[in-house]
Swiss-Prot record:
It is found in: Nucleus. A zinc finger (C2H2-type) spans 370-392, 410-432, 438-460, 466-489. Interacts with DNMT3A. The modification Phosphoserine is found at S157, S516, S517. InterPro entries: BTB/POZ_dom (IPR000210), SKP1/BTB/POZ_sf (IPR011333), Znf_C2H2_sf (IPR036236), Znf_C2H2_type (IPR013087). The keyword Thylakoid does not apply. Keywords: Developmental protein, DNA-binding, Isopeptide bond, Metal-binding, Nucleus, Phosphoprotein, Repeat, Repressor, Transcription, Transcription regulation, Ubl conjugation, Zinc, Zinc-finger. The lineage of its organism: Eukaryota, Metazoa, Chordata, Craniata, Vertebrata. Residues 121-143 have a biased composition (Basic and acidic residues). Gene3D superfamilies: Classic Zinc Finger, Potassium Channel Kv1.1, Chain A. Residues 24-91 form the BTB domain. One of its GO terms (biological process) is in utero embryonic development. It comes from Mus musculus (Mouse). This is Zinc finger and BTB domain-containing protein 18.
C-alpha cells in the first residue's frame, strides 16, 4: 500500500525542523551568513556535500563555502529548493544561481539556469532587432516626408489653387505613421508636357486640384520631375565643378607640402638612381638582369611621381652586385663549355647576389641586415641566412657519417638498442630482466624506479599534499586530483577561465586608438 503524499509530507517536516533549528547537525558558512541544515538532506541533494562528508563524518560540523563563487542569497535559494522542491529566482541574477549550483554539483539546477539564460539572450536579441527595424522605418518615413516637402516647394503653383488644395498635396507625418503599409504620396498631375510611360500625356488637374495617385504613378512622376530638374539646373553643375576643383587644389597643396618636407631628408640619405637616362653612355648595363627585375619598380616610381631612398650603407652593396653580375656575364661569354660543378656554383652565387637588390625593400623598420659569419655575405632576413648557412655545412660535412666501429656505444645485448650513456642502458635492461631494486621498508613492495617508490611511500604516511581549491578535498597523488577536477569541476573551471580572460584582455577599440596611433606618428 503506497502513500503518494509521503515524500512531500517528509520534506515539509524537515523544512519546519530546519526553520526551528531542531536536529540540525551542521552549519554552512557563506561569508558572514550562517545556515543551519541537516547533513542527510545536503548530502542527498548535492554531490559536493556528499563527497565532503564521505571521508570524515564526525569532524565536519562546520562547512565553509567559497564566498567568491557562492553568494549568500544564491545558497539560501538552493537550500530552499533542497527542502521544498521549488525553485523561485525572485530578483536574484541567474548567473549567481548558476555559479552556486555548479560549485555544489547540482546539475539539474545548472541545466535550468542555462536554459533561462539562453531564453533571455534570444528575447533580448529579438527586442533589439524590433527596435532597430522601428527606428529604420521611422528614418525612412522622415526622409520621405522631407524629400516630398522639398519637391512640393519646387512645384510650380497655380494662382487658381487655394491654400487648402496645397495642404492636401502631401500627407503629414502623422498620416504616414498611421499607415505604415502605404508608403506613397499624393502628387498633383501637372505633367502636361511630359509623356507618361505608356506614351500618353496625363490630363490636367480638376478645379479642386485633389487627385489621388497610385504608388506606381507617384514613383513615375517623381522620376520624371527629377529628370526635368536635372536638365534645368545648370547652376548646380557649376557649383559641383567648383567643389571638385577646390578638392584637387587641396590635394596638390598636400603633395607640395609632403615633397617639401622630404627635401630636408636628402642631406642624410643617399639617393638611388633607379631609372637611367636614354642619353647615358653605359646603356649596355641596362640590359642586364638587374634592370629587368626592377622594371616594375621604375614604372611604379614614374606613375606615383615619388622619390625612393635607401640607407647609405646599402648603396655599395648594390654597386657590388651590379659589378659581379657584369663579371659573370663576361666569364660566361668567354667560356663555351662549363662543367656541372661550376654551373652549380654559378647558380648559387646568382641566387645570393640577386637577393642583394631587395635588401632595402625587405628590411625591417629598424634597418637590420644579417651577415654570414663564414663568407661575410649580407642577407635581408634570418631565414634566408639560415638557408645560406645550410649550404656551407652541406659542403663541409656532407652526409653525416656513422660513428666508427671502434667507439664503444652503450648497446643493449638483447634488442640491440643504443643509448647515450650507461645509466640509461641499465634502466632499459630492467625491462628485460624484471629487476626491481627499490623496495619499500613498510610493506616490502619492490619497484623498478626510485620515483615510483617515493610515490608509493605516501600511502603509508597518509599524507594528502594535493588539495582541490574548489571543494577543499585532498588527495595523495596528483593524478587523483586531476581526475577529480575533470569529473566534478570541469564546467566551473572552464566558465571561470573564460571570464578571467575576458576581463584581463584589452578591448580592440583601446588597442587601435592608443597603440596604432603611436606607431603611426613615430
Amino acid at each position: 500500500m503506497e502513500f503518494p503524499d509521503h515524500s512531500r509530507h517528509l520534506l515539509q517536516c524537515l523544512s519546519e525542523q530546519r526553520h526551528q533549528g531542531f536536529l540540525c547537525d551542521c552549519t554552512v558558512l557563506v561569508g558572514d551568513a550562517q545556515f543551519r541544515a541537516h547533513r542527510a538532506v545536503l548530502a542527498s541533494c548535492s554531490m559536493y556535500f556528499h563527497l565532503f562528508y564521505k571521508d570524515q563524518l564526525d569532524k565536519r560540523d562546520i562547512v565553509h563555502l567559497n564566498s567568491d563563487i557562492v553568494t549568500a542569497p544564491a545558497f539560501a535559494l538552493l537550500l530552499e529548493f533542497m527542502y521544498e522542491g521549488k525553485l523561485q529566482f525572485k530578483d536574484l541574477p541567474i548567473e549567481d544561481v548558476l555559479a552556486a549550483a555548479s560549485y555544489l554539483h547540482m546539475y539539474d539546477i545548472v541545466k535550468v539556469c542555462k536554459k533561462k539564460l539562453k531564453e533571455k539572450a534570444t528575447t533580448e536579441a529579438d527586442s533589439t532587432k524590433k527596435e532597430e527595424d522601428a527606428s529604420s522605418c521611422s528614418d525612412k518615413v522622415e526622409s520621405l516626408s522631407d524629400g516630398s516637402s522639398h519637391m512640393a516647394g519646387d512645384l510650380p503653383s497655380d494662382e487658381d489653387e487655394g491654400e487648402d488644395d496645397k495642404l492636401n498635396i502631401l500627407p503629414s507625418k502623422r498620416d504616414l505613421a498611421a499607415e505604415p503599409g502605404n508608403m506613397w504620396m499624393r502628387l498633383p498631375s501637372d505633367s502636361a508636357g511630359i509623356p507618361q510611360a505608356g506614351g500618353e500625356a496625363e490630363p490636367h488637374a480638376t478645379a479642386a486640384g485633389k487627385t489621388v495617385a497610385s504608388p506606381c504613378s507617384s514613383t513615375e512622376s517623381l522620376s520624371q520631375r527629377s529628370v526635368t530638374s536635372v536638365r534645368d539646373s545648370a547652376d548646380v553643375d557649376c557649383v559641383l565643378d567648383l567643389s571638385v576643383k577646390s578638392s584637387l587644389s587641396g590635394v596638390e597643396n598636400l603633395n607640395s607640402s609632403y615633397f617639401s618636407s622630404q627635401d630636408v631628408l636628402r642631406s642624410n640619405l643617399v639617393q638611388v638612381k633607379v631609372e637611367k637616362e636614354a642619353s647615358c653612355d653605359e646603356s649596355d648595363v641596362g640590359t642586364n638582369d638587374y634592370d629587368m627585375e626592377h622594371s616594375t619598380v621604375k614604372e611604379s616610381v614614374s606613375t606615383n611621381n615619388r622619390v625612393q631612398y635607401e640607407p647609405a650603407h646599402l648603396a655599395p652593396l648594390r654597386e657590388d652586385s651590379v659589378l659581379r653580375e657584369l663579371d659573370r656575364e663576361d666569364k660566361a661569354s668567354d667560356d663555351e663549355m662549363m662543367t656541372p660543378e661550376s654551373e652549380r656554383v654559378q647558380v648559387e652565387g646568382g641566387m645570393e647576389n640577386s637577393l642583394l637588390p631587395y635588401v632595402s625593400n625587405i628590411l625591417s623598420p629598424a634597418g637590420q641586415i644579417f651577415m654570414c659569419p663564414l663568407c661575410n655575405k649580407v642577407f635581408p632576413s634570418p631565414h634566408i641566412l639560415q638557408i645560406h648557412l645550410s649550404t656551407h655545412f652541406r659542403e663541409q660535412d656532407g652526409i653525416r657519417s656513422k660513428p666508427a666501429a671502434d667507439v664503444n656505444v652503450p648497446t643493449c645485448s638483447l634488442c640491440g638498442k643504443t643509448f647515450s650513456c650507461m645509466y640509461t642502458l641499465k634502466r632499459h635492461e630492467r625491462t628485460h630482466s624484471g629487476e626491481k631494486p627499490y623496495t619499500c621498508t613498510q610493506c616490502g613492495k619492490s619497484f623498478q624506479y626510485s620515483h615510483n617508490l617515493s610515490r608509493h611511500a605516501v600511502v603509508h604516511t597518509r599524507e594528502k599534499p594535493h588539495a582541490c581549491k574548489w571543494c577543499e578535498r585532498r588527495f595523495t597523488q596528483s593524478g587523483d586530483l586531476y581526475r577529480h577536477i575533470r569529473k566534478f569541476h570541469c564546467e566551473l573551471v572552464n566558465s571561470l577561465s573564460v571570464k578571467s580572460e575576458a576581463l584581463s584582455l584589452p578591448t580592440v577599440r583601446d588597442w587601435t586608438l592608443e597603440d596604432s596611433s603611436q606607431e603611426l606618428w613615430k
